[in-house]
Every structure is written in C-alpha cells, then in structure tokens.
A protein has these predicted regions:
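Hydrophobic core segments within long, regular secondary-structure runs in both alpha-
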Residues: 34-42, 59-62, 87-101, 118-121, ...
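C-terminal low-complexity, acidic/polar tails when present
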Residues: 49, 70-104, 109, 119-125
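Alpha-helix boundary/capping segments in eukaryotic regulatory proteins
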Residues: 30, 69, 73, 105-115, ...
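Alpha-helical repeat/alpha-solenoid scaffolds of the HEAT/ARM/MIF4G superfamily
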Residues: 1-88
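Alpha-helix N-cap/helix-start motif at coil-to-helix transitions, marked by capping-box chemistry
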Residues: 56, 88-91, 111, 115, ...
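Helix-loop junctions that connect tandem helical modules in alpha-solenoid scaffolds
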Residues: 2-10, 40-53, 96-111, 124-127, ...
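Alpha-solenoid helical repeat scaffolds
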Residues: 13, 17, 57, 116, ...
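Hydrophobic residues within the alpha-helices of tandem HEAT/HEAT-like
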Residues: 22-26, 58-69, 114-128, 142-147, ...
C-alpha cells in the first residue's frame, strides 16, 4: 500500500482538471452522461454499490457539470439539448436522492445523503431561481432532516 499526500494546491488543480474533463465529456454526449449518472444512482439506491464514497463522488460529478447540459448543441450532429433536458435530469436525480433518504437506514447514512442533496442544489442556483416549487420541496425536506437529533452534533444554546 502506498500513501500519497497531495498539497492543497495540487488537490485543487486535480479537482479543476476533473471538473473540466467531465464538462467536456458532457458536452460531447449529454444523453450518455445522463444515462451513466442515472445508472450509477440506481445502483446506489438498490444498494448494490452503496457507500458514502461512491455517493459523494457521484454527487460531486453531478454538481461539477452544472449548466453544461443546457448549453450543449451540435450543429452537424444529431444532438440538441435545451434547458428541459437538464431540468428533467436534475429533478429526477434529486427526487431519487430524496427517496433514498426515506429508505436508507441509519442517521449517519441519511446525513450523507442530505449533505449531497444540499451540495447538488447549491451548484444549480439558476435552476432553483426558476423553479421555486422544487426549491421549496427540497428545503422543506432538508429542514425535516435537520430537526432530527444526531449524536455528537447537537449544540446547546443554554450554558450548563
């Protein structure tokens, strides 16, 4: 086993390179990207590939391509994608994650799913601004989750 330590600047450069690569691949084939990410999410939901790391990686990938799906058009190819494609993908993805919070066991697992929902939603501000009803649903679900108690994470507002 070899342990590699990256400096923060190296980590940031790697993050940006991966993000640009995902954006480029998404622009090449939006539909294929959507299918791959949806299939990966389905394997998270059915438990066959469930892990915090897998879910975090997938949700980071979805957040990193924010706005890319709705800006894709090939003049000589058959692909034409508008904002509806990104909207459909994002709504379905978040709905699946919200469903996962209902069916998954364990508060820590639920916390991981909820934090990933917050991350993805935070990466698509233009979408949320245009779809208030969807934003309201997500925010209500997150507040519902926040009212649950988590051992070791409670903060008292009253001094002892």
């Amino acid at each position: 086993m070899i342990r590699e330590v990256l400096k923060e600047s190296d980590t940031r450069a790697l993050y940006l390179s991966l993000q640009e690569c995902l954006k480029a691949l998404t622009k090449l084939d939006v539909i294929d990207t959507e299918v791959i990410m949806t299939d990966k999410l389905a394997r998270q939901v059915d438990g066959s590939e469930w892990s915090w790391s897998n879910l975090n990686t997938l949700c980071w990938a979805v957040g990193s391509i924010a706005g890319t799906m709705s800006n894709t058009c090939l003049v000589f190819g058959s692909q034409f994608v508008d904002e509806e494609t990104e909207k459909r993908f994002l709504v379905n993805f978040i709905k699946e994650l919200l469903g996962l919070t209902e069916m998954i066991r364990g508060k820590d697992n639920k916390a991981v799913v909820a934090s990933n929902i917050m991350y993805i939603v935070g990466q698509y501000p233009r979408f949320l601004k245009a779809h208030w009803k969807f934003l309201k649903t997500v925010v209500n679900k997150l507040f519902e989750f926040m009212h649950e108690t988590h051992e070791g994470h409670s903060i008292s507002i009253y001094p002892c």
